[in-house]
Amino acid sequence: MAKETLGRLGLGALVGQWSKLTNILESHITGDPTLRFQSINEVDANALFKEPYSESRMLELLQSPYADIQNFALHNLYRNDYPGISDLLRKTFETSSFMMVRFTCLALLEKISDKNFREVLHLAITDSYEFIRRTSVRMMQHVGLNEYVYPQIKAYVEDNLSERVAFNVSLGLQVFDQAAVQAAIDKVMAETYVLQDKEEMRKVLENANNSRSMQKELLSKETSERCRILYCNSLKNHMAHACVDGLLALLTDSSESEKLKTCLLEAFAWFTHSYRKPDILRVCDQLRKDKSLSENLREEADRTYYRLKN
């Protein structure tokens, strides 16, 4: 949000108006919310922000030559439940020449988390703006569909000047099905125009794909409970969609400890974009209604259920 809105200061917005939309400490500018800069353009963002919401006005502002004004309009349309907002965001992402407008569209589509969001990720990973490419990799890994494996492997091999894109790819391959990742590696290596360091890249990718010991140890009853809980917490950052079936079986296994199940339910609350969310919701609904379980476990299942559902 900080990047999306910073340009409004140059159009006359108050620092306070800007900071209301910015929730990260690194973006602090000054403690005086009334500070503003005089706009050198015909736009007065201060006056614009004071206008009452009007759908037609926001749609009109989408034609502004300023990316910051377009972003303002998109956020307002989203917050006010504009009908067709998802289609509008997708179309704008596909057609806008402004990288920050495209990023705004992607960020808002992530909040909606529908078919348009999942499909636009295929475009985002080849966007000209590195931050969008890097962000799309994270989003793909949060969704977990195997159809995202090939474009990520291709980006790792052919987008070889973007180190952070490559890092994000290698860090999250383990959340996908192992066989799908290996198949994508083989396919990309057979097709790519890249000749230099191919075998070295293959080795790095295959090592990343085979680094699944934490998932295996989490599912193993031979692992200490302390380590299993530690591995559960790691699922909040790396949603292991490939082993969701095993994790759901753990939740319904009467021989597993309540402490471990509670920790796993808490971790599942982070699977907000996962394609396995319906399965997680089904089991959480079952657990929260099971009167034979402890109140603590049912409450945790209830919290996760409503976080994912809403």
Q: Where are the language model's segments positioned?
A:
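Short inter-helical turns and helix N-cap capping residues of alpha-solenoid HEAT/ARM repeat scaffolds
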Residues: 65-66, 97-98, 128-129, 160-162, ...
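Structural detector for internal amphipathic alpha-helices that build alpha-solenoid repeat scaffolds
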Residues: 70-80, 91, 102-114, 123, ...
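Long, charged low-complexity terminal regions
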Residues: 184, 197, 211-216, 224-231, ...
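Catalytic binding pocket for nucleotide-activated donors in carbohydrate/polymer assembly enzymes
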Residues: 1
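Glycine-centered coil turns and helix-coil junctions that link the paired helices
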Residues: 95, 159, 235, 253, ...
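Caspase-like cysteine protease fold
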Residues: 4-83
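Amphipathic alpha-helical scaffolding segments comprising HEAT/armadillo-like alpha-solenoid repeats
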Residues: 52-61, 82-93, 114-125, 146-157, ...
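Eukaryotic acidic, Ser/Thr-rich intrinsically disordered low-complexity regions
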Residues: 285-310
